[in-house]
């Protein structure tokens, strides 16, 4: 997923839209033309800390994007990992730019980190340092809080990115994970790159099939997904009916066997009457 992640989210307009979605409700405060790739020693050293994409903004701000893969895990230590990365990044910057010490009144570039969680399961790990560490009574005022800038695409929250490609990607994941297509989206056309990246993340074969059938341009997706969700729901209903019938038959047999036992019939006699094994009767009586 790493290659596709960098390919899709690394595009300047897509990259800034993630930050605009979280910070400015999709308003184009951050501009893609002010971004530049950061290829310095800093990136070489901190990329091992699992930062997927690092870019510099015009004013020197570092914008960093963590992408948490759907098939991997929810990392309980994510808060600590982000803190570690930012600390390493700041110290690297200081060493690169100041020989002995930092001059008085110097201000370092801001490091803004966003964690984009694209998994299906609920994010149940800490979102704040206070949720990860034990804070003893009386120490609350001395504790330095730290929180994740976390975007979760499997929740009911609808993020506005202000950019079609990332908005389409966000909404596709919500549809797949919630197994629901809104009526107003049935004829909506989705960005083809967003469609493919959604497939890479979810491994949904229907998305891949739709992608392969389309050659270029935007793609209609929702009617096929809606049919897939409906078929899945119907299969679940049929399975439930089948299980209910089987349980009903088993319960009826149990009641018959129990009534005969109450009337003094032995298990051996009951087995002979119904042409079943004694073991099957005993198992049913124990199970139910």
In which residue ranges do the predicted regions lie?
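Elongated, amphipathic alpha-helical interaction scaffolds
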Residues: 1-288
């Amino acid at each position: 997923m790493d290659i596709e992640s960098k390919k899709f989210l690394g595009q300047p307009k897509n990259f800034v839209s993630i930050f605009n979605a979280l910070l400015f409700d999709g308003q184009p405060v951050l501009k893609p033309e002010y971004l530049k790739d950061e290829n310095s020693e800093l990136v070489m050293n901190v990329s091992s800390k699992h930062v997927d994409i690092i870019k510099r903004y015009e004013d020197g701000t570092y914008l960093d994007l963590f992408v948490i893969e759907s098939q991997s895990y929810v990392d309980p230590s994510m808060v600590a990992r982000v803190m570690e990365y930012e600390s390493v990044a700041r110290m690297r910057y200081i060493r690169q730019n100041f020989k002995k010490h930092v001059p008085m009144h110097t201000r370092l570039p801001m490091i803004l980190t966003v964690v984009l969680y694209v998994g299906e399961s609920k994010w149940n790990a800490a979102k704040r340092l206070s949720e990860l560490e034990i804070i003893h009574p009386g120490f609350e005022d001395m504790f330095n809080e730290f929180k994740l800038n976390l975007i979760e695409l499997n929740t009911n929250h609808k993020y506005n990115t202000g950019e079609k490609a990332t908005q389409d990607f966000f909404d596709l994941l919500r549809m797949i994970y919630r197994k629901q297509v809104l009526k107003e989206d049935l004829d909506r056309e989705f960005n083809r790159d967003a469609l493919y990246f959604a497939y890479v993340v979810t491994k949904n074969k229907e998305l891949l099939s739709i992608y392969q059938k389309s050659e270029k341009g935007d793609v209609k997706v929702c009617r096929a997904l809606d049919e897939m969700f409906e078929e899945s729901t119907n299969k679940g209903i049929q399975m439930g009916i089948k299980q209910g019938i089987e349980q009903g038959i088993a319960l009826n047999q149990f009641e018959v066997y129990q009534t005969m036992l109450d009337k003094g019939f032995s298990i051996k006699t009951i087995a002979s009457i119904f042409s079943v094994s004694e073991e099957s009767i005993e198992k049913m009586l124990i199970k139910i």
